[in-house]
């Protein structure tokens, strides 16, 4: 009897959108679907299980054998137990301390793995994307905040407590504003979309700006994208914020290449679309802080985030964990 071709399910739990897809072991996304993450208290787990069940049914209808499920979630994850321990996003608070991998495995009858979403994203870029064939690869993901996924010498770096990659909470301004993490002047405060938008909404009440008009007169409608568009049109307030974001991200890249010396760096996420015209300025700023030889020898790619990329990350997590656990390697 011929065995059905194998397929994986990759899931990315974002703070606003949950994405899932069927992915072949070589990274080809066969189909994908999305659902809002913010559906109300108690809905995160049923929404995830529902998308997984729908994808499992689709795999069966296609004559494909589901092999495993990989899920990326935002926050601190216990990868061995397959659960989210803590996240700053209230949208996923329902997942805290929930044995998600166990629940998904019980639903599907196949192994399930859970890790930090940026770790999964980094594994996807390393296996299927711009980090292919590199022994070391760092992914900086810039969405509402900034996080990093680190592959060094072919191993995902999680750190002793799972906090490795929290580059968004590296202080770059010791006298800067307070961060929700308890620190001050953290990198995320200057480049994260949520923080850029919040600061702009706050400052328009006391500084002249076209931002309110661009947002249709609604301060709450101002987003990071609004700020970048206003800066491109010459708005002084927006330009000052975008210039600072370029300097801050340049410093973040310098920290990355000086501290880790990776073969390749990928900057991705929802904010990156707005950063594309500013790549040259960001790299120039990085050159002001980085060791020249380290920066010159490291390709830095800017890639806007997209659904297939995050879904592949979940599939890559499966492949990585199966290989790691099969070899008996520590996490």
Language model regions located:
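A mobile "lid/hinge" subdomain adjacent to the ATP/sugar-phosphate binding pocket shared
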Residues: 23, 188-264
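Glycine-rich phosphate-binding loop and adjoining helix at the ATP-binding site
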Residues: 37, 42-49, 53, 61, ...
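Glycine-rich beta-strand-to-loop/alpha-helix junction loops that act as flexible
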Residues: 69-75, 267-271
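Glycine-rich phosphate-binding loop of actin/hexokinase-like ATP-binding domains
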Residues: 134-190
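Glycine-rich phosphate-binding loop plus the immediately following alpha-helix
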Residues: 112-118, 172-207
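Short glycine-aspartate micro-motif
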Residues: 8-12, 66-70, 113, 137-141, ...
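Short glycine-rich, Thr/Ser-proximal phosphate-binding strand/loop in the N-terminal lobe
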Residues: 2-50, 83-86, 162, 329
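Glycine-rich phosphate-binding/hydrolytic loop that grips phosphoryl groups
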Residues: 23, 113-116, 120-126, 273-331
């Amino acid at each position: 009897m011929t065995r059905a071709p194998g397929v994986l399910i990759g899931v990315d739990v974002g703070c606003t959108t949950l994405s899932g897809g069927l992915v072949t072991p070589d990274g080809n996304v066969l189909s994908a679907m999305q659902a809002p993450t913010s559906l109300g208290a108690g809905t995160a787990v049923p929404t995830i299980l529902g998308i997984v069940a729908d994808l499992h049914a689709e795999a069966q209808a296609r004559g494909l054998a589901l092999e495993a499920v990989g899920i990326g979630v935002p926050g601190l994850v216990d990868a061995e137990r397959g659960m989210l321990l803590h996240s700053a996003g209230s949208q996923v608070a329902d997942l805290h301390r929930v044995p998600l991998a166990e629940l998904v495995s019980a639903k599907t009858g196949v192994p399930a793995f859970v890790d930090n979403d940026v770790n999964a994203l980094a594994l996807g870029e390393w296996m299927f994307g711009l980090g292919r064939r590199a022994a070391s690869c760092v992914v900086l993901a810039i969405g509402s905040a900034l996080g990093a996924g680190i592959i060094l010498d072919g191993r995902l770096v999680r750190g002793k407590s799972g906090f490795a990659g929290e580059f968004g909470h590296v202080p770059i301004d010791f006298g800067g504003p307070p961060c929700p993490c308890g620190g001050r002047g953290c990198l995320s405060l200057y480049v994260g979309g949520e923080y850029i938008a919040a600061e702009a909404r706050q400052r328009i009440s006391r500084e002249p700006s076209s931002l309110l008009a661009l947002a249709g007169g609604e301060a709450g409608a101002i987003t990071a994208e609004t700020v970048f568009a206003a800066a491109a049109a010459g708005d002084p307030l927006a330009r000052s914020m975008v210039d600072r974001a370029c300097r801050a991200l340049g410093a973040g890249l310098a920290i990355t290449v000086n501290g880790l010396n990776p073969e390749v760096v990928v900057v991705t996420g929802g904010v990156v679309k707005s950063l594309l015209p500013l790549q040259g300025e960001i790299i120039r700023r990085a050159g002001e802080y980085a060791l020249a030889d380290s920066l010159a020898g490291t390709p830095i790619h800017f890639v806007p985030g997209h659904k297939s990329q995050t879904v592949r990350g979940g599939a890559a997590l499966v492949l990585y964990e199966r290989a790691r656990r099969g070899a008996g390697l520590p996490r």
